[in-house]
């Protein structure tokens, strides 16, 4: 049995208190608690506490400490239930305490995976223009359940996906102007897959792209790569030269007819 002899406010935090006790051998420092625990257990000078009660106080203090760590972590941005659990594990908090903290956070509505998933989907689609596949994968990695993700993705209709994909194409295609039309389409296709768009949405968007690509741009790309390979292979003669030129330009996505026209032009120049 111990008797509380003194309670003093900590110098660095007015919300924490040092508790001094006497176990029969004079006053000594016992433990420190948050003000929430002080009030919860009615700690005051002269109160007698046994070992069981002391154990309960110290356990609840650990819960409160972990709770405040979680609140601080949440102050920067919303988090999922799993993110909170992972954060506390890294802080070496025990599983029993983690369960209590998460339960309290859920009760206090500091964490809500349904709300998180909806807001995350809106942000990633509107700001970062990610496709639904990537958004789903990221939410799964954050521990959000499949059913909740399916509900949140209803906030991201196909029309919006197409709008975003077309925006990404328009932004990126400028860097592929020196590629053949086919190669440009392949690179844009790869980019949209990485961004998380479905095959259906990608095909719709690339079909629109086909109507925008003019012959002049295609010819510019052909001449750019053709002249580059011409300088590389002009040391070869006859069949070897033409074969290497055809293989190189074909790999770049140009048709046989386009390649033949370019080679004929080079013959006439020579």
From Swiss-Prot:
Subcellular location: Cytoplasm
InterPro entries xref list: RecX_HTH_1st, RecX_HTH_2nd, RecX_HTH_3rd, Regulatory_RecX, WH-like_DNA-bd_sf
Keyword Transcription regulation set for record: no
One Gene Ontology CC term in the entry: cytoplasm
Pfam families in the cross-refs: RecX_HTH1, RecX_HTH2, RecX_HTH3
Keywords: Cytoplasm
GO biological process: regulation of DNA repair
Keyword hit for Metal-binding: no
Major localization class: cytoplasm
Family note: Belongs to the RecX family.
Purpose: Modulates RecA activity.
Protein name: Regulatory protein RecX
């Amino acid at each position: 049995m111990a008797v509380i002899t003194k309670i003093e406010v900590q110098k660095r935090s007015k919300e924490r208190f040092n508790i001094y006790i006497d176990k029969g051998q004079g006053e000594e420092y016992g433990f420190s608690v948050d003000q929430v625990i002080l009030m919860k257990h009615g700690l005051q000078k002269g109160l007698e506490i046994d070992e069981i009660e002391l154990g309960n106080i110290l356990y609840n203090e650990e819960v409160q400490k972990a709770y405040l760590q979680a609140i601080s972590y949440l102050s920067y941005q919303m988090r999922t239930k799993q993110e909170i659990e992972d954060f506390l594990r890294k802080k070496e908090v025990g599983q029993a305490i983690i369960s209590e903290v998460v339960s309290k956070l859920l009760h206090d509505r500091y964490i809500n995976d349904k709300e998180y998933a909806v807001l995350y989907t809106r942000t990633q689609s509107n700001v970062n223009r990610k496709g639904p596949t990537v958004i789903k994968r990221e939410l799964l990695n954050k521990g959000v359940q499949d059913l909740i993700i399916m509900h949140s993705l209803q906030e991201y209709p196909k029309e919006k996906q197409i709008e975003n994909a077309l925006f990404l194409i328009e932004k990126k295609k400028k860097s592929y102007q020196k590629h053949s039309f086919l190669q440009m389409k392949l690179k844009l296709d790869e980019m949209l897959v990485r961004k998380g768009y479905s095959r259906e949405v990608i095909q719709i968007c690339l079909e629109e792209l086909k109507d925008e690509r003019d012959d002049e741009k295609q010819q510019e790309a052909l001449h750019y790569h053709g002249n580059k390979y011409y300088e590389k292979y002009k040391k070869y003669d006859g069949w070897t030269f033409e074969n290497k030129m055809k293989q190189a330009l074909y790999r770049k996505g140009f048709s046989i007819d386009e390649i033949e026209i370019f080679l004929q032009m080079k013959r006439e120049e020579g």
